[in-house]
A protein has these predicted regions:
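Cationic, low-complexity basic patches in intrinsically disordered or flexible, solvent-exposed regions
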Residues: 23
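Mature catalytic domains of secreted/periplasmic carbohydrate-active enzymes
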Residues: 26-444
């Protein structure tokens, strides 16, 4: 397999290096293209996405880190694809669920830390088409269905690889799994990884971008980021680079993402406290406790919890990327389905205050958040039982206040000290009372 890889990798190196060499110097002083800037704005407008962790690890029903957590040998893990045959996978069902949930984009694992490509890769035979009885490319089907239904598709790609011998020197997650104690790091990055990225960016039509993960395994290594980022922006200028490295954004990156956290809060303990005011923001989390399918994980977030998380993300000027881990047969857990459909029903009423908005003029608090769009400020009251809510001063004159749902007028007072709203009582099961403040337009 290694010899076969090196022969194929050499061919890819010629193709990949030719693209990237022209751009490496310029990438350090990255100037996003007009298409890229437009894609960033569209990304911010979408607000809600579906994250999907799905791979051969799903067969064991023990999460996406099972290779590492059980300390399996490479030779043992190599048997796993033989049992992966997702005969119930249906791209239309998956994309339709995302759409019903009010999600505007999907980010799916093209390969996770086990290095197994969930697409038809010619760089290595360690992929779903050549190693499983399924013999098909689900990402191709998903890409086609996303285009049909108007959903943007992003590819998650793990930079960390527990399977490839050239991922060397090994990182913080290393264990003795049977790989040799040597490897070619440059070949791994420039030939293997960039070769697969080239496939993803050329064989699946226009995509939303690449969502990177795993650089935290070797945070001080030279990942050849300038070269890889230049390659991506060369092949698809509008594709967004979204790195989950938990660090301050670097040149060439287009979105700052936070894992299991809202921007800047770092309750998870491994995210950066720095929040970019130049890049779109994203918060990712998972609908239960695991990213990949775990048969023993029934700790599902409620629909109300998901709605609250989406509102708080939007109020922090961030998207929410909510994960599901499908079954190995390709079906989606009914518990995920019912909750996501409920969120979609909620968004059919409240979506105006989420989609296309930016973080509002009032800092988020325990009581709730604000979002804004054009001359509207949406006050999302999430946790406040008193009849009056005092808000700090806002720039401009409030001309009216009304409930988003139902349109009832809301009494308010505005003075130099701020805005006081007289809140209607929350109705049963109402997790978010949204008051729309209409602001006087400049010059009016």
């Amino acid at each position: 397999m290694a010899n076969r890889y090196r022969k194929i990798a050499f061919v890819f190196a010629l193709l990949v290096c030719g693209f990237a060499a022209q751009c490496v110097t310029a990438q350090t002083a990255y100037q996003p293209s007009p298409e890229n800037l437009q894609a960033r704005r569209e990304f911010q407008d979408m607000k809600f996405g579906m994250f999907i962790h799905w791979g051969v690890y799903s067969v064991l029903g023990d999460g996406e880190w099972v290779f590492h957590n059980r300390k399996l040998k490479v030779d043992e893990y190599n048997r796993l694809p033989l049992f992966f045959d997702p005969e119930k996978f249906d791209a239309r069902t998956w994309v339709s669920l995302a759409k019903a949930a009010g999600m505007k984009y999907i980010t799916i694992t093209s390969r996770h830390h086990d290095g197994f490509a969930m697409f038809d890769s010619k760089v290595s035979d360690w992929n779903i088409v050549q190693r499983t009885p399924y013999k098909k490319d689900p990402l191709k089907m998903l890409a086609e269905e996303c285009r049909r239904q108007g959903i943007k598709l992003f590819f998650y790609y793990s930079q960390l690889d527990w399977h490839n011998p050239d991922y060397y020197p090994r990182g913080a997650t290393d264990w003795k799994n049977g790989r040799p104690d040597h490897g070619d790091w440059n070949a791994y990055l420039d030939n293997y990884m960039d070769g697969q990225l080239t496939e993803l960016l050329t064989n699946y039509g226009p995509i939303g971008g690449i969502w990177f993960d795993g650089m935290w395994d070797k945070p001080d290594a030279d990942w050849h980021l300038d070269k890889t980022y230049a390659l991506i922006h060369k092949l698809q200028p509008a594709a967004l680079i979204i790195p989950n490295h938990h660090q301050t954004p670097r040149p060439g990156e287009d979105v700052q993402t936070f894992e299991r956290d809202l921007p800047g809060q770092n309750t998870a303990g491994f995210n950066t406290n720095y929040v970019s005011n130049q890049l779109p923001l994203e918060s990712c989390d998972t609908l239960n406790d695991n990213w990949g399918f775990n048969i023993g994980d029934s700790n599902y977030k409620s629909a109300a919890d998901l709605e609250s998380r989406l509102v708080r993300a939007a109020g922090n000027n961030s998207n929410l990327l909510m994960n599901i881990g499908p079954y190995p047969n390709g079906e989606i857990d009914p518990q995920f389905v019912t909750r996501l459909q409920a969120v979609g029903e909620w968004l059919s009423k409240y979506g105006e205050s989420i989609y296309g908005t930016r973080g509002g003029p009032i800092a988020p608090g325990n009581w709730g958040v604000t979002t804004q769009k054009d001359n509207k400020v949406y006050v999302h009251v999430l946790n406040w039982s008193a009849p009056l809510l005092a808000l700090p001063p806002v720039a401009g004159k409030v001309t009216s206040a009304q409930m988003l749902v139902g349109g009832a007028t809301t009494e308010f007072t505005q003075n130099a000290n701020g805005v006081i709203l007289k809140l209607p009582a929350a109705s049963k099961d109402e997790i978010d009372r949204v008051i729309v403040l209409t602001m006087a337009k400049a010059g009016a």
